[in-house]
Regions:
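Poly-acidic low-complexity segments
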Residues: 134-136, 170, 186
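Substrate-binding cleft of extracellular glycoside hydrolase catalytic domains
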Residues: 132-147
Length: 201
């Protein structure tokens, strides 16, 4: 019976879920990233895609991550599987989608990052992508760095190619640079983009 129900959900999800359009083809496309805990349900990604679409944004892709986060509720670092969703939608849609996901899946916090031009009035953060970082080394470096725990609150490494992803406030560049080095990454090889971050909790 369960296999039949799963098949029906996949079938109807494929029929009714909107197709994620290319960013360049949408006049009001505002690119953003959304980071959420990925639970063990194999339908999580599909359900999240639908929820995001129902709240004003389209998912143009997603990446599985190994995440390390600082939990205010538990007052300790937490290691968990997560997923980065690439979004395209109207300005403000990332917040609405993040809040809906947080409530639907009972998550403590969902992080969003909206891309903006450097020096834009609303810019308050950067997203750093550094290649070839081991998740275990990053976890140890993060746990040993109080400033990183308090200021950055976490980070992720892609499960496919070991790429470190950090979202930091613009005033925390030195903290991020130090953490990348402590985790074994190369700051010179890192790519940086500018934008606005929000912890939706």
């Amino acid at each position: 019976m369960r296999s039949v129900l799963v098949w029906l959900m996949v079938l109807f999800g494929g029929v009714f879920a909107p197709t994620a359009p290319a960013r360049g083809n949408i006049p009001d496309c505002h690119p953003a990233e959304l980071f959420a805990t990925d639970n063990t349900d194999p339908l999580f990604e599909m359900q999240a895609d639908v929820t995001i679409a129902q709240n004003g944004a389209s998912v143009t892709g997603s990446i599985p991550l190994d995440g390390v986060y600082w939990s205010d509720a538990l007052q300790r670092s937490v290691y968990e599987r997560s997923r980065e969703f690439h979004l395209c939608g109207a300005d403000g849609s990332s917040h609405t989608a993040a809040d809906a996901l947080r409530r639907q899946f009972n998550q403590e916090t969902v992080l969003t990052f909206d891309y903006l031009p450097q020096h834009a009035p609303e810019e308050d953060a950067i997203i750093i992508v550094a290649p070839d970082v081991d998740i275990n080394r990053f976890r140890d470096a993060f746990a040993a760095d109080p400033a990183a725990r308090n200021r950055l609150r976490g980070g992720s490494v892609t499960t496919t190619d070991r790429t470190l992803i950090l979202v930091a406030g613009t005033g925390d560049l030195d903290v991020a640079r130090r953490l990348v080095a402590e985790a074994g990454g190369s700051w010179e090889a890192a790519a940086i983009s500018y934008g606005r971050r929000e912890f939706v909790d």
